[in-house]
């Protein structure tokens, strides 16, 4: 990334330059000011302990927001948390936030939910910001034209104490997606196809800017889905330049600017675009019209194929490391090469997570489930990304559609995205999930995960095998 030189700059470079407190001059890290710090119960306890031991306070508590998400149950939330480790982490977060004066949205609060859903819904996430959280999927917030990234626990402490972070400039990547998306193809299919194309290390060391007519046509929810999974491509962050879609989403939200402050903010936001002539370190191109519903078959997000394809044969792979990884993945997933993806039966379907737990995602699922039933032998969990999302879904009658279909309509939380709460797979169970990671044991020890879009998840629940809504007609 380039410092201010008068040369054309990318969006990421502009935001970076606007937040340099002290320049490292290319020899040392730059000290970057942080506009918004998001906190949850898993990665923050040691950071607060560090502050306490050093006798420090939180530098800017008003720029810090905490919520309970990873460990919380999604049923019986009025009861004590059963797991002692989860209970301790949640209780510790509550004590730390009370002691250090940090806003916290706890279970039962209408604004409680997954931190990467809560920030945008409150209007805290805004264009041009630097945003960090002790969570890799902080890249979600880049959908608003923010530079947002996950950080480690020691960095969480540094931001709490100073509201700054020492960082070395990143490389920049442009992912250009042009053309019209076919019917039934979503943002989730775009990002899964991209990761399959460039690999889980393809974006390493980069900030990705998603560009092109297909990206511009997406809703904010769709853009958040894509930016959310930038980390699965190895990138440090992902972002989309703000536009009228962004401004319309933010207008009127609780923490969005109003009146003259809105007008001032809008002037700045409208400048947040990559300059003509700016040079990216890497450029990637996808043809939107060529995309189709996508699904993973292996144990990393890059091991995916179109739903219409079959499980690949490792023996046809020319790269030794790729072949060995595929063989190991197929053994864990209990799949045979050549099996049609549509013939793979599932035991469970999970709709939710910071990737696909927003109201637009739930509307897509409801449209597929309306008048249909979840297949016998399939357990379907639908978990809203926040209590605010749940309330909106209830107001629109979506909850009734879910329960009428035989799905479990839960309270807000990270849920079955990861095995840190009661919502887990049993060993050997197979799940179609709208979440972001399909690692071994991610959804519970021995569980097998296929990453899919909300539409594919809903159709899969109805048919009992990996399917798209078109397969139901």
Swiss-Prot record:
GO terms for cellular component: peptidoglycan-based cell wall. Binds 1 [4Fe-4S] cluster per subunit. It holds the Pfam family Aconitase. It catalyses: (2R,3S)-3-isopropylmalate = (2S)-2-isopropylmalate. Pathway: Amino-acid biosynthesis; L-leucine biosynthesis; L-leucine from 3-methyl-2-oxobutanoate: step 2/4. GO terms for molecular function: 3-isopropylmalate dehydratase activity; 4 iron, 4 sulfur cluster binding; metal ion binding. It comes from the Bacteria. Belongs to the aconitase/IPM isomerase family. LeuC type 1 subfamily. NCBIfam families: leuC, PRK05478.1, PRK12466.1. This is 3-isopropylmalate dehydratase large subunit. The lineage of its organism: Bacteria, Bacillati, Actinomycetota, Actinomycetes, Mycobacteriales. The gene is leuC.
């Amino acid at each position: 990334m380039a410092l201010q030189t008068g040369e054309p700059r990318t969006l990421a470079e502009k935001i970076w330059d606007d937040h340099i407190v002290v320049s490292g001059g290319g020899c040392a890290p730059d000290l970057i000011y942080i506009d918004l710090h998001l906190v949850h119960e898993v990665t923050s306890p040691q950071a607060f302990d560090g502050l306490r031991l050093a006798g420090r306070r939180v530098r800017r508590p008003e720029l810090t927001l905490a919520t309970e998400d990873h460990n919380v149950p999604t049923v019986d939330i009025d009861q004590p948390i059963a797991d002692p480790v989860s209970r301790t982490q949640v209780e510790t977060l509550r004590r730390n936030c009370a002691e250090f004066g940090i806003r916290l949205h706890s279970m039962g609060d209408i604004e409680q939910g997954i931190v990467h859903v809560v920030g945008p819904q409150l209007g805290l996430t805004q264009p041009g910001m630097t945003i960090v959280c002790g969570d890799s999927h902080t890249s979600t917030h880049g959908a608003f034209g923010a530079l947002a990234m996950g950080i480690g626990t020691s960095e969480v402490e540094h931001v709490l104490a100073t509201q700054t972070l020492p960082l070395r400039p990143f490389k920049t990547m442009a992912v250009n997606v042009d053309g019209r998306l076919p019917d039934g193809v979503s943002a989730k299919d775009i990002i899964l196809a991209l990761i399959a194309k460039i690999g889980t290390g393809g974006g390493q060391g980069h900030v990705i800017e998603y560009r092109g007519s297909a990206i511009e046509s997406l809703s904010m929810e769709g853009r958040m889905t894509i930016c959310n999974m930038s980390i699965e491509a190895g990138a440090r962050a992902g972002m989309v330049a703000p536009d009228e879609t962004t401004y319309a989403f933010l207008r009127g939200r609780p923490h969005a600017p109003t009146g003259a402050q809105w007008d001032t903010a809008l002037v700045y936001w409208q400048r947040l675009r990559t300059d003509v002539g700016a040079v990216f370190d890497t450029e990637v191109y996808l043809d939107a019209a060529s995309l189709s519903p996508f699904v993973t078959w292996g144990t990393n997000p890059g091991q995916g194929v179109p739903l219409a394809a079959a499980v690949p044969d490792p023996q046809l792979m020319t790269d030794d490391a790729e072949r060995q990884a595929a063989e190991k993945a197929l053994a864990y997933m209990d799949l045979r090469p050549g099996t049609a993806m549509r013939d793979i039966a599932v035991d469970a379907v999970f709709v939710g997570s910071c990737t696909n737990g927003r109201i637009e995602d739930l509307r897509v699922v409801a449209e597929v489930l309306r008048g249909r039933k979840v297949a016998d032998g399939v357990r379907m969990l639908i978990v809203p990304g926040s209590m605010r999302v749940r309330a909106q879904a209830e107001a629109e009658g979506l909850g009734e559609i879910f329960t009428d279909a035989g799905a479990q309509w839960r309270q807000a939380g990270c849920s079955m995205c990861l095995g840190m709460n009661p919502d887990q797979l049993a060993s050997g169970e197979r799940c179609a999930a709208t979440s972001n990671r399909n690692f071994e044991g991610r959804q519970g020890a021995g569980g097998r995960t296929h990453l899919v879009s909300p539409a594919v998840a809903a159709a899969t629940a109805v048919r009992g095998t990996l399917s798209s809504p078109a397969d139901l007609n």
